[in-house]
From Swiss-Prot:
Keywords linked to the UniProt accession: Disulfide bond, Secreted
SMART domains for this protein: Knot1 (SM00505)
Listed Pfam families: Toxin_3
Protein name per Swiss-Prot or TrEMBL: Neurotoxin-like protein STR1
Domain LCN-type CS-alpha/beta: 2-65
BP GO annotations: defense response
Recorded superkingdom: Eukaryota
Localisation: Secreted
Disulfide bonds: C13-C64, C17-C40, C26-C45, C30-C47
Entry keyword annotation includes Disulfide bond: yes
InterPro entries named in the record: LCN-type_CS_alpha_beta_dom, Scorpion_toxin-like, Scorpion_toxin-like_sf, Scorpion_toxinL, Scorpion_toxinL/defensin
Amino acid sequence: ARDGYIVHDGTNCKYSCEFGSEYKYCGPLCEKKKAKTGYCYLFACWCIEVPDEVRVWGEDGFMCWS
């Protein structure tokens, strides 16, 4: 497991979020992806302890594509 920005399935696009909604939105979203938890960091959802089988941003480059 590792920490990172989760991406939308089939894309390399991060989940955007608003500052101030740190845990309300990203926490449950990260948990759905089987991570321990997560929060909003630099306007995207950063997840803690993401399982190795779940892709995170940067593994397939840094451009958003769909």
